Amino acid sequence: MELKQSLSTHLEAEKPLRRYGAVEETAWKTERLGRNQLDIISMAETTMMPEEIELEMAKIQRLREVLVRRESELRFMMDDIQLCKDIMDLKQELQNLVAIPEKEKTKLQKQREDELIQKIHKLVQKRDFLVDDAEVERLREQEEDKEMADFLRIKLKPLDKVTKSPASSRAEKKAEPPPSKPTVAKTGLALIKDCCGATQCNIM
């Protein structure tokens, strides 16, 4: 029994020490790796250039802005539709009161008529403010579109020089237009402007 214990102790002493994190252990692992694996020092996709990554991020930012614009546009549309509905309801009630002869109107009916006129006036003013805000937002978006188009045009120039071969660059003398960017339909603004027009609410 004592002979077995001494033999096992002797075998354990002869085993090489493996200290994780030591220089010797790290060198032993790297010997089994290929040259291509050792060259990869980043988890990012190495086939993309820094300029391409920056351009891709700019496009993603652009898409995010388009979604935010669309959400804002839908909110404008919902507010305008609700205002038009409220104004039309008040206007219908006012028309019913106006149809009553003046001599037959009670005091409460006259008071209600004045209240309806004031409410309609306030709602029309509120809608005018909404239209003005939509116009300011549209002008701001146009300025942002211009800045983004200039930015993408500047960023695409060096990439075109790298990706195009000399033969293709000689063949394509004509300059290409800037990349098409996502656009938001002006449905909300058009609806805000036309909702109370002659063909719609006839509020004014």
Curated annotation (Swiss-Prot):
Q: Which organism is it from?
A: Homo sapiens (Human)
Per the database entry, which stretches of residues form a coiled coil? none
Which InterPro entries does this one have?
A: bMERB_dom, C16orf45-like
Question: One GO CC term of this entry?
Answer: microtubule cytoskeleton
Q: Which PANTHER family match?
A: BMERB DOMAIN-CONTAINING PROTEIN 1 (PTHR22704:SF1), BMERB DOMAIN-CONTAINING PROTEIN 1-RELATED (PTHR22704)
Region Disordered: start-end pairs = 162-187
- Protein name (record): bMERB domain-containing protein 1
One matching Pfam family is: bMERB_dom
Q: Name one GO biological process term.
A: cell motility involved in cerebral cortex radial glia guided migration
- Using the record's annotation, list all stretches that form the bMERB domain: 3-150
